[in-house]
Amino acid sequence: MRYVISLLLLIGGLSCSDANQPLPGPVGVFDTGAKTVTGQWPLATPSELGLSAESLLNLHNDVLQERYGWIDSLLIIRNGRIAFEQYYEHDYRAVYGDEAQTLGPLVVNSPSGPYNYFNAFWHPYFKDTQLHSMQSVTKSILSAVIGIAISRGDFPDLDTPVLSFFNVDKTAHVDDQKRAMTLRHLLTMSEGLRWDENIPYTDPKNTFTVMARSLDWVQFTLDQPMESEPGTRFNYNSGASLILGQIFLQSTGIDIEAYTAQHLFQPLGITNYEWKRTPFGLADTQEGLFLSTRDLAKIAYLYLQKGRWNQKTIIAESWINDSLRAAFKLNDELRTGYGFQWWSQRYQYQDKSYVAYLGKGFGGQRPIILPDFDMVIVLTGWNILPDKPFLHAEEAIERVLSSVIE
């Protein structure tokens, strides 16, 4: 049964008159074992962390009323302590039951398999556990592991050509542009391959959907023709992260799941996770991870702390900075950028401009890092149909920061 931090935390920050009003939704219990940031998280009332309990309760009410579709969890950490944590139950077997039976863009290869996004056995929670699908937040964690491997001398220089790891004679559309493609280009999704992942995943013309029906996803991606000079244009491509996963295996001789467990998860105290495999048997480094909300928060908090955890360096600060720095500034209207498999989001607060850093996963997975407020926001959800309301990162930041009182 999934644990829930009690809304009594919020009551502690409300006035007596507010506290006497009935609370929406189920009231859970404190996790009294939450004592240290290296194991369980320490708890605090919102007011102790300079946040308005009333504002957070308003946000909670909107989530309960499904203003933002199906959000599964919301966790807010400030100054290293949990200010708010709530889990929202949805009967996904009932919600998506009909769609789960028929092959289509979101039911790939087999209705009973791990790439049926409507199958409640696999999504959003792994087999009724607390492990939630991370979707493309997996890419951000892949970046973290590559950074660790580079610092340990286990991964090649980022300017190494991609084709040096593959049989060129068995790769389609090889030209000078493809020969110029490097690991850095894969990390920043500027590799130049022809790829359209900007249309909804429900559209069978989405290149990712076409790839998912193939047996060897890495080779499928590598075989795509070039459409731009590497390093000149950002184009979101999940296949690029899969190529990085294959190169990781070839470079280190170690499966990335085992390497991640030893060098990232173990130092953070992450012991429960699941990692899907592609049809070819490779760890799915573009969307395959399942983590609990609290463990995802550990990843975000590690980046907030510049790679340090429990006074030890897990990821080099230089890699953290390079990962979060926007290699490409994307949409001026949305004010977004993209680094090493991490997004950046510019936002306004009290007439000042700030930058947030985040991972983005299909369905609503959002670890959001706000360095200027010593804050981490983690959202999980399963809004996988294009017509469903959605809590976008900028609005999530705005809603949470509206609760800041000091």
Predicted regions and their residues:
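Short, charged, amphipathic alpha-helices and their helix-cap/turn boundaries
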Residues: 86, 96, 100-122, 160-163, ...
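Structured C-terminal helix/loop/strand segments within mature extracytoplasmic catalytic/sensor domains
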Residues: 359-406
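N-terminal leader/targeting segments and the immediately adjacent pre-domain N-terminus
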Residues: 14-126, 150-155, 214-215, 227, ...
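Active-site helix/loop module of the DD-peptidase/beta-lactamase fold
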Residues: 122-123, 128, 152-193, 223-226, ...
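Active-site SXXK
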Residues: 57, 80, 103, 113-114, ...
